Amino acid sequence: MSDELDTIVAADNDKYMIRCENLVKIYKTSDVEVVALQGLDLDVERGELMAIVGNSGSGKSTLLNMLGGLDKPSAGNLYVDGKDLLKFTDKDYMEYKRNTVGFVWQNNARNLVPYLTAVQNVELPMLLNGEHKRRQKALELLDRVGLLKRKNSRLDQMSGGEHCDLV
């Protein structure tokens, strides 16, 4: 992380991986304002498993987009790993998305590059992040999810379940 990003740390959030305080998201068009999220308070402790469930239009995707750095809150406080996302610059968001969070779309086809092999798909984010020993790390990850034998397979040679495991 950059020195700039390290200075955007909330003092009392060491206990929490995610903390939302009175979080608000308003989408605006020329004529209409839609309140997608209003006054959300949420604490997720480190190591805690959390499921976000709710009716259609209840703000689940809005919250996840903000946690994933794909959208910015309109008001309130949002901390991830002790960092205050409301103070992020565009550069901070880029670094955050590369090093802190991952976002997996429901449609796996959007998460993978079809003409690359399984191992190349795993290596791609590491390449963009400048990591060394990418091939070794990619092979270890494929082994962990039981896909080492499919390392040289392209997506059209793999099942839907294998796509999910690969993502």
Where do the language-model regions lie?
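A short, flexible loop at the N-terminus of ABC-type nucleotide-binding domains that lies
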Residues: N13-C20, I26-G39
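Conserved ABC ATPase "signature" region
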Residues: R19, K83-D84, E131-R150
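ABC ATPase NBD coupling module
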Residues: D31-V32, L85-G102, L128
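The feature captures the beta-strand-to-loop junction immediately N-terminal to the Walker
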Residues: V53-N55
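Helix-to-loop junction immediately C-terminal to a conserved catalytic motif
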Residues: G68
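Conserved ABC transporter NBD signature motif
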Residues: G76-D84
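Short coil-to-helix segment of the ABC ATPase nucleotide-binding domain corresponding to the Q-loop/switch region
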Residues: P114-E123
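Conserved ABC ATPase signature
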Residues: R154-C164
